[in-house]
Amino acid sequence: MKEHAPSRRDFLCSTSFVAVGLATGGSMILAPDNAWALSPTALDSHTAQTLVVMARQLFPHDRLGDQYYATVVEAVDKQAASDAALRKLLTDGVARLDGARGIAWVQLSNGARNAVLKTEEAGEFFSTVRTATINNLYTNPLVYRFFGFEGSSVEHGGYIDSGFDDIGWLPNA
């Protein structure tokens, strides 16, 4: 797979994650592949990192870095700070994932992780993480560019007035 050089925006976004993480201190997860950090306040580092991997496992996109999936966990962590039931649901869910095969779930192969997730599929934990991922990953303006979405058009008069048919990837009819 061909790697693309990071843009100025990628660089600034990545370094801002690190700067904020260093400024806040506390428990911080540093990713080995990119310069970003996650500083959970309600969840422990292991739970937060597992949820990042779970979000990626549920909605994998090769071109998206883990820092985009970390925004999902940041949102859930913020909610869990004021909701003890949610915090317990997430920590218990991660404990079940880890206990399914006797080792940390994140250390399993993709196939084994999927098999363990399949056992959680009907439960509230799975549903909560899936919904949080959809609501926080796909509404992130920084993610739009990876999918060729130009963002909301409401502020600019709607799609009809701004050339809704100007996209280049549809065949000419």
Language-model features: where?
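C-terminal segment of N-terminal export signals and the immediately downstream linker at the start
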Residues: 5-6, 22-61
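Short acidic alpha-helical/loop segments enriched in Asp/Glu that coordinate divalent cations
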Residues: 64-72
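Alpha-helical structural elements of signaling/regulatory helical domains
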Residues: 60, 64, 82-85
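Mature-region segments of soluble proteins
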Residues: 49, 53, 71-173
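Residues marking the start of alpha-helices
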Residues: 2, 39, 101-104
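Hydrophobic/aromatic-lined pockets within catalytic cores
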Residues: 16, 20-23, 59, 63, ...
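N-terminal secretory signal peptides and thylakoid transit peptides that target proteins
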Residues: 1-22
